[in-house]
Structure formats: C-alpha cells, structure tokens
Amino acid sequence: MPNPTVKTITDVGIDLDGVMYPFVDAFREYCSIHMPDGKFPEPQQWNFYRDWGIEDDTFHRWLYEGAQSHNLFSTHYPMQGSYLAWELLRKLKVRIHVMTARPTTAWKQTADWLHHHYLVPDNLYFTSKKSMLAHVATGTAMAIEDHVDYYEDLKGAGVLTVLYNQPWNIAHPNSPRVSNLVEFAQLVEQINNREIPCLQTALVSSTQPQNL
C-alpha cells in the first residue's frame, strides 16, 4: 500500500501582514499623525489598536484613509527572511500563493509592493476564506499564518499549516511555529527531501515552542 506520509509539497500559501509585511509598524506611524502624544506599545492581542486607545470604528476608518493618503500597505520593507525564503521556495519549484484579507483600498498597493520588491507570487488572493488553498493547489499544500482563526481554517481543510510566532498567537496550543519565513521554507524543503513526514503532527514535533 502507498505510504500517505510520502508526499511532496506542491503549493504554499503565505499570509502578508505579520508574516511578510510589518503592518503594525506602518499603522503605528500613521496613528502618530492623528495622535502625536499617543502611546503605542508592542501588540499583545490581534486587535492591537485597542491597547492604543483606538475604537474599532476609528481603526477601520483610518485603515481606509491611510491606504489612500499614506500608502499604508506599501511603505515598509519586507520582514526579515522574506527574500531568502522566496529564493528557496523558487528553487523548490513550489507554486506560491499570497493570501491576504486586506481591504479593497489596499489591493493595488499590495500588487505593486510585491512587484517592487521582486516577491512576485504565482497567485495573489484577497480573501478571508484562506482554506480555498486546498482547492487551488495542484497537490499537497502548506501554509503560514499568524491569525489563529485562519490557521484553524486552513488546517481543517487539510492544509499543513504553521503559525508565524507572534504575541497574539503564542497561547494557541499544539501548533507548529516558526520565527521567520526562512524557517517555513526550510520546513517545506525538509518535507520534500523526505526528512520530515508530510503530517501536521510531524510539523508540531519538528518545531519548538518559542516564547516572546
């Protein structure tokens, strides 16, 4: 009988904000325009802006306005490891799908930013239904996320999924974790080289919990 663990990763899904793009830093800079005396501590929860004294409605309004007036989604460089990871994934000949739930005001900026930094994916999806990766993949898919809801959604769809270690997901139990995109690409390489079984449980045992 064929061994179900002997598979090759053909497609990867990569989140943007908090994985490739330092959105919190960009939004902090924008908030300082409106709140010059504000305090902006490092995020400890997904809705980090609440710790900055910003209401939900204000956050969404500034998200819209900042994208139009200050290129909120394209002002910063890619996060550590993005370039090296991209190079390794291309060498592995996997299809790269960038998947983000960014608002419509960010769509053009996002595409331009990826091209400007030579991080051009095979596909770019703007969606909150990231489990679609399971349906567009040509074979076995693997993904990286920093939002626990998307992580669970992907995992539930049968996608091998890794959490990008962030304060807002640190308490999520039994989750494989990486500290940068290079580590994710190396996991893909190890699976495709048959060094790690192609199983979610194997990913958990192959990555160590990281304290922030």
Where are these regions (language model features)?
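Short, acidic loop-to-helix structural element flanking the phosphoryl-transfer center
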Residues: Q68-V98, T104-Q109
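Short acidic-hydrophobic, aromatic-tinged amphipathic segments that line or gate anion-handling sites
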Residues: L124-S128, P176-E183
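Acidic, Mg2+-coordinating phosphoryl-transfer loop and its flanking beta/alpha structural elements
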Residues: M142-S179
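Active-site neighborhood of HAD-like aspartate-dependent phosphohydrolases
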Residues: P2-R61, H172
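Substrate-recognition "cap/lid" segment bordering the active-site pocket of phosphatases
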Residues: A101-K155
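Short amphipathic alpha-helix with an adjacent loop that forms part of the alpha/beta core around
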Residues: L133-T138, F184-L199
